[in-house]
A protein has these predicted regions:
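Blade-loop segments of beta-propeller domains
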Residues: 76-107, 118
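Blade-level signature of beta-propeller repeat domains, shared across WD40, Kelch, NHL, RCC1
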Residues: 317-348
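Conserved beta-strand positions in repeat-built beta-propeller and related beta-rich domains
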Residues: 69-73, 113-118, 166-169, 211, ...
Length: 348
């Protein structure tokens, strides 16, 4: 096993340590309660000779069922797959730091992708075929950041009115808000190294729009703190939920549930941050953990969630979860031997 130091995770977009955990074979059942899944590690039929990947960072699904996998291999940043795992298209932005991928349909129903590059600081909107139709201004170029502020965007989300939220997760830890045409509106969040700091981040890794309540909210990951934060659409802090032991990537909200890939984890007798300890975590409408595929069954005592740990090494370092229209999951992994996504077939 390799420990990930706090200094390493905060100091660089990519971690250089290699996990020694081994993925389990096909067929085992993981998860708990109503969310149990059969693991298929061989679902993806892509071949490294023709469609190589480095890290499989994120995946989204279009309305027509196609799956878009985002990888930081410059030959093919995007692999387009059908639900049988076959590659049906591939294209590239030429990015070495391809990281965050979001899909959104506009008021006319047209779907676009929003992509981030942690290396160059680029954030673009593309067609599903890969044509760039808009690029957001770098915050330093419009006076939002100083020349000394680091900008390394990890994720985007699109609000109900088209506002675009950019998580500067490997940079200065702000959430930056632009309107649908790319005009900068405001920023909120920011970095704090204090153990408890409402609305502040240690690695604002992921962001999504949570429309499960009466009013839509911005939901963002504070990964190093094992927390999710919620804000109003304008950036006012609302609440925090703490998931002890889970270094989550981004929140993926489908129906009443939140899904997230846990990239790093702990041991029962070692609370440091380790690679090879990944699993998937699933929350209900009330943001209580109800299932941990690959992890131990969630336990609450006196209303407090207990430490969550990997149960068996099905996964190395989970970086994202895509939920298809049938409720099956596709798990993307970072720094895990260049494996393609695993499919988890819904059983429960």
């Amino acid at each position: 096993m390799n420990e990930v130091s706090r200094r390493t995770i905060l100091g660089a977009p990519y971690l250089a340590l290699v996990s020694k955990a081994a993925a389990a074979g096909d067929g085992r059942i993981v998860g708990h309660g109503t969310h149990r899944y059969r693991v298929d590690t061989k679902w993806c039929q892509a071949k490294p000779e023709t469609h190589p990947v480095n890290d499989c960072h994120e995946m989204v699904q279009a309305r027509d069922g196609r799956l878009f996998l985002f990888t930081n291999h410059k030959q093919n940043n995007v692999l387009v797959l059908d639900q049988r795992g076959r590659v049906i298209d591939a294209w590239t932005l030429g990015w070495a730091g391809a990281h965050g991928l979001t899909i959104h349909a506009d008021a006319e129903g047209r779907e676009h992708l929003y992509a981030t590059d942690t290396s160059s600081g680029r954030v673009v909107k593309t067609t599903l075929a890969g044509d760039v139709v808009m690029e957001l201004a770098h915050p330093a170029s419009i006076g939002v950041y100083s020349d000394k502020d680091v900008y390394s965007p990890t994720e985007t989300a699109v609000g109900p009115n088209g506002d675009i939220y950019v998580a500067d997760g490997y940079g200065s830890q702000f959430l930056l808000r632009y309107d649908k045409d790319g005009k900068f509106l405001n920023k909120f969040g920011g970095k704090s190294s204090q153990p408890i700091s409402k609305g502040k981040f240690l690695q604002a890794h992921g962001v999504a729009i949570d429309a499960r309540g009466e009013q839509p909210l911005v939901m963002a990951t504070a990964r190093i703190r094992n927390e999710f934060h919620w804000f109003t659409l304008e950036g006012e802090f609302v609440k925090t939920v703490y998931l002890p032991g889970a270094y989550m990537s981004r929140p993926v909200i489908v129906g009443e549930n939140v899904y997230s890939g846990v990239c790093f984890g702990m041991f029962a007798d070692d609370y440091r941050m380790w690679q090879g300890r990944g699993f998937v975590t699933i929350l209900d409408r009330n943001n209580r953990v109800i299932s941990n595929p690959g992890g131990r069954k969630p336990e609450y005592r006196d209303g407090r969630l207990q430490l969550m740990l990997q149960d068996e090494p099905v996964f190395h370092n989970c970086h994202d979860v895509c939920v298809d229209q049938q409720g099956d999951l596709y798990v993307c992994q970072w720094n895990s031997g260049k494996v393609y996504p695993y499919k988890l077939h819904r059983e429960g």
